[in-house]
């Protein structure tokens, strides 16, 4: 495979943000690796899983995140925050078909980097590309770990879509951040009758 690979994660059922990312990378990258948490929160989990599977080609390029584990019952929803439980109590946040997210790998080795959902504990002597934090950039305490950002729920600016790209010739990592219409997502949450506190989660986040 030549060219560049897009490494992305934390779509969180946000099809609008995912399609913004696809449009930005189409024709520029030759492949995709997904770092997990395709599901959870947003109203389009099944559509997002199908889109990500199509991008990655096979399930090998999709990694299990903690929200896949919540969907599968491998992690206990009762131990999550009340807000997470409110999202999960609302039917559109749930996958109807669990088959595509069952048995996903926990990691994917891409040249000199190991791709996995969250930063490893304890650290290992290698380089990592991770999601989970919903933030982007090198880890301030561990520069061997790069956080690629979040497609569907960026913490630093809720109206941004963030991901990383790796040049397969040089192995250089480039970080990308672009805006998307988050108000359209909130309109969809209202149309799907999400509780007010779920919509407020997006509304009160900073933008740029």
Question: What is each model feature region?
Answer:
Residues 4-5, 59-60, 125-127, 172-173:
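Short active-site oxyanion
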């Amino acid at each position: 495979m030549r060219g560049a690979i897009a490494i992305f994660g934390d779509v969180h059922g946000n099809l609008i943000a995912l399609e913004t990312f696809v449009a930005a990378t189409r024709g520029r990258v030759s492949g995709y690796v997904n770092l997990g948490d395709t599901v959870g929160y947003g109203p389009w989990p099944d559509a997002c899983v199908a889109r990500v599977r199509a991008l990655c080609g096979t399930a090998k390029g999709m990694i299990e995140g903690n929200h896949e584990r919540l969907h599968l019952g491998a992690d206990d929803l009762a131990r999550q925050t009340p807000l997470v439980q409110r999202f999960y109590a609302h039917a559109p946040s749930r996958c109807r078909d669990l088959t595509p997210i069952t048995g996903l790998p926990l990691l994917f080795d891409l040249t000199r980097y190991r791709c996995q959902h969250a930063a490893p504990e304890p650290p290992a002597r290698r380089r990592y590309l991770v999601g989970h934090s919903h933030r982007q950039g090198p880890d301030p305490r561990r520069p061997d770990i790069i956080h690629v950002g979040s497609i569907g729920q960026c913490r630093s600016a809720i109206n941004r879509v963030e991901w990383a790209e790796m040049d397969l010739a040089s192995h250089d990592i480039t970080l990308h951040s672009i805006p998307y219409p988050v108000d359209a997502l909130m309109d969809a949450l209202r149309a799907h009758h999400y509780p007010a506190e779920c919509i407020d989660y997006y509304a009160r986040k900073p933008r740029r």
